[in-house]
Amino acid sequence: MPKRVLTGTVVSDKTDKTVVVKVERRVKHALYGKIIKRSKKYHAHDETNEYREGETVRIEETAPMSKLKTWKVIERVDTHATPNHA
């Protein structure tokens, strides 16, 4: 079975070798039909601490590394993002 790959925005890079990535998806409301946004946060492994808050990254599912980390960052998608901290 292929590994899942998701694209999202880094919302936190405060922990060592870990980033929190927010992945948004658009779904249609079952009754009213309006398109609404749903989001979920994933803890992803960042071995070199190179990804910063605000960047768009691609993450891939891996074997569990800890209680929360079952994803790893593959690559940076958007290089023009400006980090929120100095």
Curated annotation (Swiss-Prot):
Does Ribosomal protein show up as a keyword for this record? yes
Keywords of this protein's UniProt record, alphabetized?
A: Ribonucleoprotein, Ribosomal protein, RNA-binding, rRNA-binding
Q: Which GO terms describe its molecular function?
A: rRNA binding; structural constituent of ribosome
- InterPro entries, alphabetically? NA-bd_OB-fold, Ribosomal_uS17, Ribosomal_uS17_bact/chlr
Q: Name one GO biological process term.
A: translation
> What Pfam families does UniProt report for this protein, alphabetically?
Ribosomal_S17
**Please, which domain of life does this record's source organism belong to?**
Bacteria
Gene Ontology cellular-component terms for this entry are: cytosolic small ribosomal subunit
Q: How does it assemble?
A: Part of the 30S ribosomal subunit.
Q: Which family does it belong to?
A: Belongs to the universal ribosomal protein uS17 family.
Please describe what this protein does: One of the primary rRNA binding proteins, it binds specifically to the 5'-end of 16S ribosomal RNA.
Task: Check the record and name the HAMAP family matching this protein.
Answer: Ribosomal_uS17_B
Q: What is this protein called?
A: Small ribosomal subunit protein uS17
